Amino acid sequence: MSKTFFVTGTDTDAGKTTCTLALLQAAAAKGLKAVAYKPVAAGCEMIENKPCNQDVLLLQKHSALPLQYEQVVAYSFDAFSSPHIAAEESGVTIKLDVLSEGLSRLKKSTGADIIFVEGAGGWRVPIGNGHFLSDWVKYENMPVIMVVGARLGCINHSVLTYEAIHHDMLPLVGWCMNRITPSMNHYQQNLETLKSLLPAPFMGEIPYINKPDEQDLGKYLDISTLL
């Protein structure tokens, strides 16, 4: 049976996709069949006359098994905005059971050892009709991996995100630090503070890298606590 983990971030552009690629590569290095799923993606570009989300394409490319675009994502919207706004503009209602059906089909069709489910935005991103994406994560009872985007304010964002996950009675099974800029004042002090405040395994640091999707990212994360 597939192990499933939800990857959330401390904010939009914290580096969820970069971290998910690293997780996929780290799992592959251990001989595991790992694939990715993104329940909701907002922001598409025309590629070969088809609207596609770049994050979904990267997850599709780096999954250990061949997947169709539609297997990786349940809802893909054109607008670069919060999912609930993108859905409303498209005249679509995001349904939790559709998210679950997509995940279930992926499990059955691939027989993957691990599925990394990448969220959208932060933990409390709304998806419409009074629901948050975190409501679905809670319904699926998924363990959570948190990506901390290294920027001023990340300590507050990280602690608040952890508290929200804990409030939802879900386990934070690991977290990583992702450097989203070449330099950050007091980076090491921020990292050490987070290590002392977050009661979850520290999985590693992903350095600032140009074109991270073309690099070996798996070496930066220790996934032993997930296995």
UniProtKB/Swiss-Prot annotation:
Top-level division of the source organism's lineage: Bacteria
Active-site residues, Swiss-Prot/TrEMBL: K38
Compartments, as annotated in UniProt: Cytoplasm
Cofactor: Mg(2+)
Primary residence: cytoplasm
Pathway linked to the protein: Cofactor biosynthesis; biotin biosynthesis; biotin from 7,8-diaminononanoate: step 1/2
Binding site for ATP: 13-18, 55, 118-121, 178-179, 207-209, 214
Catalytic function, reaction form: (7R,8S)-7,8-diammoniononanoate + CO2 + ATP = (4R,5S)-dethiobiotin + ADP + phosphate + 3 H(+)
Subunit structure of this chain's protein: Homodimer.
UniProt family annotation: Belongs to the dethiobiotin synthetase family.
The protein's role, per its UniProt record: Catalyzes a mechanistically unusual reaction, the ATP-dependent insertion of CO2 between the N7 and N8 nitrogen atoms of 7,8-diaminopelargonic acid (DAPA, also called 7,8-diammoniononanoate) to form a ureido ring.
The protein's name in its UniProt record: ATP-dependent dethiobiotin synthetase BioD
Gene name of the record: bioD
